[in-house]
A protein has these predicted regions:
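Structural recognition of an alpha-helix C-terminal capping motif at a helix-to-coil junction
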Residues: 30, 44-51, 55, 64-76
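DNA-recognition helix of helix-turn-helix
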Residues: 79, 131, 137-162
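Internal acidic/polar
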Residues: 2, 80, 85-110, 129
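A short pre-motif secondary-structure segment
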Residues: 119-123
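N-terminal module of bacterial RNA polymerase sigma factors
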Residues: 1-26, 110, 157-162
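Arg/Lys-rich amphipathic alpha helix in sigma70-family domain 2
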Residues: 55-62, 72-91
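Short, charged helix-capping/linker segments at alpha-helix termini
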Residues: 10-19, 29-48, 136, 141, ...
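C-terminal flanking helix
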Residues: 25, 29, 50, 113, ...
Length: 162
């Protein structure tokens, strides 16, 4: 994304900020939906993230970290919504005759804690490298690797070694 546009947004240009949000809207929607698993909560999270972005963009110190900063805001909003509702995420609704393996995989993903699902999502759905995940989540890279290993081991056990 254009650093100059980000700098304009930091200086208070709301049109620039809106353009930046529009540029990232697809990935932000996918991330929110992967956590919240329903459309209304996803839209609420996106709306709250947008408000926080517009009111706090002036606090962004490094324009090159805009996307990371934005995703972190969204992850915090999603965590807030989950805590507020104090509920577990429902299993994805099956549509038609999906293969049993896919259904089992969705169930295994749903059984993970939000933080674990976040790691899996960033690694396998967004194709982030371990180093990028570590930066995004503010964790040591070794911690990311070990947590991913543990999560995958747990999922393999749940899926019966698939």
């Amino acid at each position: 994304m254009d650093v100059k546009l980000i700098e304009q947004a930091i200086k208070g240009n709301q049109d620039a900020c809106v353009l930046l949000l529009q540029h990232h809207q697809d990935v932000l929607y996918r991330i929110a939906y992967s956590y919240l698993r329903n459309e209304p909560d996803t839209l609420d999270a996106i709306q709250e993230m947008t408000i926080r972005c517009l009111t706090r963009i002036h606090t962004l110190k490094e324009p090159t970290y805009f996307k990371t900063w934005l995703i972190r805001i969204l992850l915090n909003v999603c965590a807030d919504l989950n805590r507020k509702k104090q509920r577990t995420l429902p299993v994805l609704q099956e549509k038609g005759y999906e293969e049993e393996v896919h259904i089992d995989l969705y169930r295994a993903l749903d059984e993970l804690e939000v933080e674990q699902r976040e790691l899996i999502y960033l690694k396998y759905f967004e194709d982030y490298q371990n180093k990028q995940i570590a930066e995004q989540l503010q964790l040591p890279e070794g911690t990311v690797k070990s947590r991913l290993h543990t999560i995958l081991k747990k999922m393999r056990k749940r899926l019966g070694g698939v």
